């Protein structure tokens, strides 16, 4: 009878240990809601847009509700982690504790160098005048829609030109970006 009591006690202790081990919440697997006051985050298209041209990668990492060590920026190919330089359109953004991979969309940048140049102005003009072979779509259309109104228009071209000539980016003074 005493042996039976010891066995029951041993089984009870093992069950308690297993419950204790398997019921612990591992902080590394909790999904966190991604937030930023600087950038527009789209869960639908998995993009982070409204990134100002020439934004340093370290500065970019500090603009989220996570520690910068938990933000990882990868080259457009998705394999090489970028530790310095500027963020460019098409770069891949991963976060510890968040399953989704996001794509960076720098305002006005479509050649992935993180800047606005005559190349982007030329592409925007060709799109606006309707040249069929030069119509922008996807992340490039989002990048060239610098005023964020959902369309690429002469106003966007004008803003791009002013930026290249004067170095000022006028994007409606938006403090809180909206996702496309």
Residue ranges and their predicted role:
Residues 23-29, 37-180:
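Cellulosome-associated attachment modules in secreted, modular CAZymes
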Residues 8-13, 33, 130, 135:
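Acidic/proline-rich low-complexity IDRs
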Residues 2-26:
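Sec-dependent N-terminal signal peptides of Gram-positive bacterial secreted proteins and lipoproteins
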């Amino acid at each position: 009878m005493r042996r039976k009591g010891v066995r029951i006690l041993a089984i009870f202790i093992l069950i308690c240990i297993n419950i204790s081990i398997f019921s612990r919440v591992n902080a590394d697997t909790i999904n966190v809601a991604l937030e930023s006051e600087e950038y527009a985050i789209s869960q639908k298209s998995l993009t982070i847009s409204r990134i100002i041209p020439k934004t340093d990668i370290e500065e970019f990492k500090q603009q989220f509700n996570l520690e910068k060590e938990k933000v990882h920026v990868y080259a457009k190919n998705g394999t090489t982690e970028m530790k310095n330089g500027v963020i460019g359109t098409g770069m891949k953004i991963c976060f510890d504790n968040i399953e989704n991979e996001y794509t960076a969309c720098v305002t006005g940048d479509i050649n992935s160098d993180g800047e606005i140049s005559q190349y982007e102005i030329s592409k925007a003009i060709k799109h606006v005048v309707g040249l069929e072979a030069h119509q922008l779509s996807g992340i490039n259309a989002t990048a060239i829609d610098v005023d964020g109104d959902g369309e690429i228009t002469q106003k966007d071209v004008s803003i791009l030109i002013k930026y290249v000539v004067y170095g000022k980016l006028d994007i409606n003074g938006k403090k809180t970006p909206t996702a496309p």
